[in-house]
Amino acid sequence: MSKAITDVFYTAFKTALPLTSSPLVQCITNEITVESMANALLYIDAKPVMADDQREFPEFFAQSDALLLNLGHISEVRQQNLLAAGKFAQATNQPTVIDLVGVSATQLRYDLGHQLLVNHPNVVKGNISEMRRFADLKSTGRGVDGSQLDQSVTALGELAASLQQLTQAFPTTTFLATGKIDLVVSAKGTWYLKNGVPQLDRFTGTGDIVGALIAALLGTGLDNDAAVVVAVSYFNCCGEVAAAQNRTGGLAAFREGTLNQLSLLAATADWLQMVKGEAL
């Protein structure tokens, strides 16, 4: 029998948000969503720094509490910076999130993702189609978007099994595949998260923001699984509230409402009652 996600991670849900400290999150990311990610971190009272020059790594790593590596915009220089940061994080025990943006689209990103995995990051995430490609399963994703064809019950179970195999080689890494149902897999278990609304797929940067939120929670000392489950659930609940308040507005208003809720929802005592998900 499955167990409710809020029962499994009860303490984390009760204490993680609002933040009681302001973790500094170093983000090596893309130009498309960098402003959204920085503001999302500020909205939850974390602190962002978008520093991707290797020459500054020793000083920034000495100050930061977590690292986010996002593959959203690749160049030769950025690839080298991502690889260098991954190694630096492993050497300094910096909590790290790898966001596999576009890994289902090109061989270069697939190879880079696996190079970064060798450093045993805390979290590796992507949409369902990206994570299927990363796990060497057939993926029907196009560009950086996930495909509905990859989100059937059978496909989700297949991906869960493949990611569980990956945890045998990387037991300290938690894997997240986002979609209509979000899949979280680690050496400790498998969880389905079931919040969210379709509109979240219709403005750019939602996955990037989730990666930043996970990194912030890791920076407070939360363990990998709890950081992933709380961050994903919180962001999806923000989207649900925004959708309920924006029944006649367009997507731009929905986007603004979702981002507004990042700074508001955690102060609502009953937001935990919104959370839906289960342990398998």
From Swiss-Prot:
Record-listed E.C. numbers: 2.7.1.50
Sequence intervals crossing the membrane: none
Keyword RNA-binding set for record: no
Positions contributing to ATP binding: 125, 178
CDD domains per the UniProt record, alphabetical: THZ_kinase
UniProt-listed GO biological process terms: thiamine biosynthetic process; thiamine diphosphate biosynthetic process
Record carries keyword Kinase: yes
InterPro entries: Hyethyz_kinase (IPR000417), Ribokinase-like (IPR029056)
Cofactors named for this entry: Mg(2+)
Amino acids binding substrate: 50, 205
Pathways involved: Cofactor biosynthesis; thiamine diphosphate biosynthesis; 4-methyl-5-(2-phosphoethyl)-thiazole from 5-(2-hydroxyethyl)-4-methylthiazole: step 1/1
GO molecular function: ATP binding; hydroxyethylthiazole kinase activity; magnesium ion binding
Keywords: ATP-binding, Kinase, Magnesium, Metal-binding, Nucleotide-binding, Thiamine biosynthesis, Transferase
Catalyzed reactions per annotation: 5-(2-hydroxyethyl)-4-methylthiazole + ATP = 4-methyl-5-(2-phosphooxyethyl)-thiazole + ADP + H(+)
Broad class of enzyme this protein falls into: transferase
Domain of life: Bacteria
Cited function: Catalyzes the phosphorylation of the hydroxyl group of 4-methyl-5-beta-hydroxyethylthiazole (THZ).
Family the entry assigns: Belongs to the Thz kinase family.
Protein name according to UniProt: Hydroxyethylthiazole kinase
Organism: Lacticaseibacillus paracasei (strain ATCC 334 / BCRC 17002 / CCUG 31169 / CIP 107868 / KCTC 3260 / NRRL B-441) (Lactobacillus paracasei)
